[in-house]
Regions:
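Charge-dense, low-complexity intrinsically disordered segments
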Residues: 105, 169, 173, 193, ...
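Short, well-ordered coil/turn elements that cap or connect secondary structure elements
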Residues: 65, 84, 153-155
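Acidic/His-rich segments in extracytoplasmic proteins that coordinate ligands and/or metal ions
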Residues: 121-188
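A charged, amphipathic alpha-helical module
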Residues: 2-68, 184-232
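An N-terminal, globular interaction/scaffold subdomain
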Residues: 52-53, 59-60, 67-126
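A structural signal for short, well-ordered beta-strand segments and their strand-loop junctions
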Residues: 71-72, 89-93, 137-138, 159-162, ...
Length: 232
């Protein structure tokens, strides 16, 4: 190994250490603010503990070892299919200024913050939540999602879904074909077939989760908007 290679490795190690320290510190502040809010239900505790485990402790999510994790970059990713195939969807929205700062040096300047944050998380590679994902599902809803899919494909298996923006038959037919392609990929990964029964159960579960999420969001009217640590 040359001296230049050693310097590069040392630089990458320092960058990862700074990223992990800053990201963890930021997560601690935000979680503390959330815990200090009044009126939050006790049922919120497991979610806060999970966030603390992943973003402060830098640990993997509590997913069984025999259940593959599938990263998703949009709410339009069909979680029902992922659950029905025996996998676990993980939302990777990349809302992190720390990751954005890293990605800002890796992608073109005109790229949007979402692209830069996504690249930052993947290039630093310190988050177990990202490393544990065996596949990424990226619904292409804008130009930045196209860029994200291209970047991720160099490091993970990526399935793109071109969500129709018009009600034309050709667009809908293409989207349906891509959904069937995603089903095949999921079944190959998990070794399980998506059946009517498994899909029905998954749809009921995600529907119930969406309903509970809407109830949770209603608490915003009662407790107000949480101030950011910087503004506090």
């Amino acid at each position: 190994m040359t001296e230049a290679d050693l310097r590069l490795r040392e630089r990458e190690a320092r960058m990862k250490e700074r990223f992990q320290r800053k990201s963890s510190h930021t997560s601690v502040r935000y979680l503390r603010r959330m815990k200090e809010l009044g009126g939050a239900p006790e049922e919120l505790t497991p979610f806060l503990e999970t966030l603390d485990q992943i973003y402060t402790g830098m640990e993997s999510a509590d997913i069984p070892a025999d259940v593959p994790a599938v990263g998703t970059y949009c709410v339009m990713a069909p979680q029902e299919l992922i659950y029905a195939a025996g996998a676990r969807p993980v939302k990777l929205c990349s809302g992190s200024y720390t990751a954005f700062s890293v990605g800002d040096d890796e992608v073109p300047r005109d790229a949007c913050p979402l692209v830069k944050a996504a690249e930052g998380f993947m290039s630093v590679d310190t988050m177990p939540l990202y490393r544990d994902c065996r596949m990424m599902v990226v619904p292409v809803t804008c130009d930045c999602k196209k860029k994200i899919a291209g970047m991720l494909s160099a490091k993970r298996e990526v399935v793109t879904l071109h969500v129709p923006v018009k009600k034309e038959d050709s667009d809908i037919e293409l989207y349906v074909e891509e959904l069937y392609f995603l089903m095949e990929k999921l079944e190959d990964m998990t070794g399980r077939r998506i059946t009517y029964e498994s899909l029905t159960a998954a749809m009921r579960m995600t529907g119930r989760a969406s309903y509970e999420l809407s109830r949770f969001l209603s608490y915003k009217k009662q407790i107000g908007v949480c101030e950011t640590p910087e503004a506090a």
